[in-house]
Curated annotation (Swiss-Prot):
NCBIfam families: PRK05463.1 (NF003969). It holds the Pfam family D-Glu_cyclase. It is an enzyme of class 4 (lyase). Its EC number is 4.2.1.-. This is Putative hydro-lyase SAV_6940. InterPro entries: D-Glu_cyclase, Putative_hydro-lyase, UPF0317. Belongs to the D-glutamate cyclase family. It comes from Streptomyces avermitilis (strain ATCC 31267 / DSM 46492 / JCM 5070 / NBRC 14893 / NCIMB 12804 / NRRL 8165 / MA-4680).
């Protein structure tokens, strides 16, 4: 199933969303507010979510270990737990804007909470998200075209296969941000210092090098308009586990909706390396 109308970014709905605390953001999501979280709670770490039955958890942990660029693990829960030390008092079943529910690799629902779908055997993985370093890029003068245009970031399935792990396999997914040439060095420098949220780009320039035919037709998110001289810059993306779910077809999974992330209490500085 696919929704026809994309959700509006929260930064466009509320001009003060960048100043929300993570706790306030999570409370709003719990009340039913939803939309892409780029620019929300600026300076805090955002995370992708994937929850799988316990008998698939080792495969996912190994998949992440073997593919650290798209799948940098921030936390793994005990089976059945919906809490994380990354966000005091948070509930992983209710505190993301929108979720995706999968059965045998097929998308069956996109609810704003998953209490009704939760199972006692689910192990949840929180995986670093590149929205985290967008604040650092912006502070360095790098324009965020998708935020300027009130759109979700563009994400693409690539021709690069991830290293398989047990039953899990699939392609790497990337996010793309158009960057002016004069800001390319800053974009690479600032993102490289945050490896826990994907780090440096995996590719710059010609999208065909990743097997992407048309930047105007992303597989997830929204198309983003580039300025004439902008260079497309691609970062590994935490939607990669969803691509693995589609390819590997586990019996059940819950993920975040692309671009609609879990807001942690952790500051991005906590993951910055020298």
């Amino acid at each position: 199933m696919n929704r026809v109308t994309p959700d509006r970014p929260l930064s466009r709905i509320d001009g003060h969303a960048h100043a929300w605390t993570p706790r306030k953001a999570r409370a709003r999501f719990r009340w039913g507010v939803f939309g892409p979280t780029a620019g929300v709670a600026a300076g805090h770490t955002q995370a992708n979510l994937i929850s799988l039955p316990a008998d698939w958890a080792y495969d996912m942990l190994l998949f992440c270990q073997r593919n650290p660029k798209p799948c940098p693990v921030l936390d793994v829960t005990d089976a059945g737990s919906w809490t994380t030390p990354l966000a005091e008092g948070a509930d992983l079943r209710t505190d993301l804007p929108r979720y995706r529910v999968w059965e045998n690799g097929e998308l069956v629902a996109e609810p704003t909470d998953v209490v009704a779908y939760w199972r006692d055997d689910l192990v949840s993985f929180l995986i670093g998200c590149s929205f985290t370093f967008e604040w650092a890029l912006s502070e360095a003068g790098v324009p965020m075209r998708h935020i300027e245009q009130g759109r979700n970031v563009s994400m693409y399935v690539t021709s690069r296969a991830c290293r398989p792990a047990g039953r899990l396999h699939g392609p790497m997914v990337v996010s793309m941000r158009p960057v002016p040439p004069e800001h390319l060095a800053a974009a690479i420098r600032e993102s490289t210092m945050l490896p826990a949220v994907h780090g440096s780009p995996v590719h710059c320039g010609d999208p065909s090098g990743l097997g992407i035919d048309d930047l105007g037709r992303p597989d997830f998110g929204d198309p983003v308009d580039a300025e004439p001289d902008d260079i497309p810059v691609f970062w590994a993306c935490g939607v990669t586990p969803q691509a693995a779910v589609m390819a590997s077809r586990p019996p059940f999974a819950i993920t975040h909706a692309p671009g609609q992330m879990f807001l942690t209490d952790a500051r991005d500085e906590q993951y910055r390396v020298a």
